[in-house]
């Protein structure tokens, strides 16, 4: 008979059992479920709801079940529905009547909420650690390429010269915001729901604070209805994960076209590339493409979870079972992408001369020329028009700024002098932008110092 079967006269239809069961995926919560049950048992013994001997028997039994699961000696029962009932069933079979007392003052509703929070309390730092590893690679590469000039783009059109270091540090900042979002999410995960019961708590004299201390939670939930129905923390994590994947996908997209012959800015290591079954010459950036593709998968989980929650009345509803596969797959996807993307980027070889040459082509110095005129006293809008006319003139004649004589420059504005030629070099364009947040090597060097301090703080936080 089901552990909840007292009021039923017929057994559950087999189709319903299969449809209803979540053990195929929620079994990964066994550690959290057992940890929560051990803390609950200690509390029950401490307040006198079970005897010390019963508490010891329950804890010993749970520890043995955990060891057996880890050793692969446990076969889960679909008929027991989920990880909670499977463990309770195993416990009762092993220790007898004491096992039946474990669920005193507890519901699966607050139990599963607890398990998910415990799970994320472990998994979020794991994601942060992987993310910090990628950030470290970005910082190290940036430090190597402070002087590497490359084109900066808007609308995927060459805009102004920057450095590869500056470009890479832009991604450091994106991932730093992701770190902050994960910290923020973890704050709201770190609330202990056990004691909320099915929805309205219990009349029994439990000690919720004791359980929270035992499990390392910083707070207990303030409302029992909210505690069992809240999955905001899951949505928040899925949203944070979606942003991580978005940033990975943006970088992946650049890796993909940078590694093409058309750009030729980098070459991926053979270990992180694949070939073609038909075309012998091909070297494909499949890792980056898969990261880009898997981003949509994570977005889908976020949208799906929002759709699950949008119409749920208080308190618990079975719809909430849909949270786990979305959460688990998102975690697996994000961690997997970070694990493979980091060494792929670390082993990539940047073609410095190709980047430098591309940065010098075209009219990337146009803004610098306009600002040259501004420094000479011309209003910016007039300077903009003058330089636009210069660009049009060069395009019509198939020439570049560097091809123009001083007389030709002065035919567009008498403010041009010999010093204009010093403004046209890509290095001058970059070095002239030595402002906080700018691409000049000195400014990027300071950004790298700040980034190293940030990473040290993240690592210190993960070590606590």
Swiss-Prot record:
Keyword Amino-acid biosynthesis (UniProt): yes
Annotated GO CC locations: cytosol
EC number of the protein: 4.3.2.1
Cross-referenced PROSITE patterns: FUMARATE_LYASES
Signal sequence interval, chain numbering: none
An example molecular function term from Gene Ontology annotations: argininosuccinate lyase activity
Main location: cytoplasm
Compartment annotation: Cytoplasm
HAMAP family listed in its UniProt record: Arg_succ_lyase
Record's protein name: Argininosuccinate lyase
Organism: Moorella thermoacetica (strain ATCC 39073 / JCM 9320)
